[in-house]
Regions:
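Helix-to-loop junction immediately C-terminal to a conserved catalytic motif
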Residues: 223
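Conserved ABC ATPase "signature" region
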Residues: 1-14, 283-300
Length: 437
């Protein structure tokens, strides 16, 4: 789509011809960005512009903003996530409690570890690696992208032969089974094409794919919001197709991508107990106080939920399912709008839910977040399932990531390229392996 002279936004033909209401969240965000760029402004201000975009969409925005900078235009990005913009940002202004606490270059900011912690910004995983490594290896040079990380780390590690692990045919009890699932919408668009998948009980399962691949359509069948054109969805061996959403939600509950769709009450405290009250689940004042305190919402308990920040609203909708009876929790883009502090709280919560025997199914474009937490992955592409298995199996399938145009997390990519004897999925494990070798 040529939106102005020299500026092109790649939007698929089906997106250009569709009604905005029929697009996925990321596709709608792409269209909004394209419409603003069509005005060709001298100064462009963008507030969390890529929060709903897949890696392809983020790369598109990166490229366009790079072209704008090269042509002398100014862009101001308001965001707590520097992962996508690290390569194009020149200057950083840090604001804490309404005051400017930093005003300087990107490289200065990336060296200021204490300030990064205070602001709770989300950093590129390469910067996290540099920060952790510099504490143990004082002479390491700063890096913030993959090329720099490769160059700096290549001479510091000794490649080892990584033992090829046979894919263990781990048996599991599927809590949800999907059989030959087809979804055709009223306009003829086929959102899901003969999808077969199983969800292992008590695991963290990630649903991956580009915007428009069918991820949200898929999970909306799991809690009955969508009825399939054909196919079957079973919960513990029993079909859910004849049941209402209210009946299904006692066992399988969905937290929407956009929290405004789930906020109904006048206060944060009432919102927290909404699901439990609707399901007739008992709870105590101690339960409420403990959750609000642990997740830093105790000062907000009498406030109107819609007045919270985006990240707090999203966290509140997730917290509201903690008191429900559901043992399968579906999270659609759970990190949307969250800063580093909230994401840290979310990770702990998800791991605690798993420890309690719950099954968590997550849709997310935040690939490092997914690889830190997920045990099992299902990948969709244009409505078809192209992979199902553990993340250990997935990292051996580069062809799958090439097909869906998603990059491996930096720690996984570097584990492979540096010849570590084991592929690791988080920064702490990576640093341990690098310093060991």
């Amino acid at each position: 789509l040529q939106i102005a002279e020299g500026w092109t936004v790649e939007l698929p033909e089906e997106v250009l011809r569709a009604k905005p209401s029929e697009l996925s969240g990321g596709q709608r965000q792409s269209v909004c960005i394209a419409s603003v760029l069509a005005m060709k402004p001298d100064i462009l201000i963008m507030d969390e512009p890529v929060s709903s975009l897949d890696p392809n969409g983020k790369k598109m925005v990166q490229d366009i903003l790079g072209e704008l900078r090269d042509s002398g235009n100014t862009t101001v990005i308001v965001d707590n996530n520097l992962v996508w913009s690290a390569g194009i940002v020149d200057h950083v202004v840090g604001i804490l409690d309404g005051e400017v606490v930093f005003d300087g270059s990107r490289d200065e900011f990336f060296r200021n570890f204490e300030l990064q912690e205070k602001l709770g910004v989300i950093l590129p995983q390469e910067v996290e690696i540099y920060r952790a490594l510099s504490a143990k290896v004082p002479d390491v040079k700063m890096f913030y992208n993959m090329d720099q990380a490769r160059a700096e780390l290549a001479g510091r590690t000794t490649a080892k032969t990584r033992a090829e692990k046979e894919a263990a045919a781990e048996s599991f009890n599927p809590v949800i089974s999907v059989k030959d699932l087809v979804k055709q919408f009223s306009d003829g668009f086929i959102g899901l094409k003969q999808v077969n998948a199983q969800v292992p009980e008590g695991k963290i399962v990630a649903i991956l794919g580009q915007n428009g691949s069918g991820k949200t359509t898929f999970v909306k069948h799991l809690n009955g919001l969508y009825k399939p054109t054909s196919g079957e969805v079973d919960y513990r061996g029993e079909s859910i197709l004849g049941k209402s959403v209210a009946q299904i939600s006692k066992n399988i509950i969905l937290v929407f991508q956009h929290p405004e769709h789930m906020l109904f009450e006048e206060t944060v405290e009432k919102e927290l107990t909404f699901c439990a009250r609707m399901q007739g689940v008992d709870f105590t004042e101690e339960n409420i106080t403990e959750i609000l305190t642990r997740y830093h919402l105790e000062k907000e308990k009498e406030n109107f939920p819609l007045n919270l920040s985006m990240g707090q609203k999203h966290m509140l909708t997730i917290l509201s399912v903690l008191l429900s009876s559901a043992d399968v929790i579906l999270l659609d883009e759970p990190t949307l709008g969250m800063d580093g502090f909230l994401i840290g709280d979310l990770e702990k919560m998800v791991l605690e839910l798993k420890k309690a025997g719950k099954t968590i199914i997550m849709i997310s474009h935040e690939i490092p977040f997914v690889f830190r937490l997920a045990d099992y992955t299902v990948i969709l592409n244009h409505g078809e399932k192209v992979f199902e298995g553990t993340k250990e199996e997935l990292v051996e399938r580069e062809d799958i990531f090439d097909k869906i145009n998603i990059e491996f997390p930096p720690v996984v990519r570097l584990s492979k390229e540096l010849g570590l004897d084991e592929i690791v999925f988080d920064v702490d494990d990576f640093i341990a392996k690098v310093t060991e070798s």
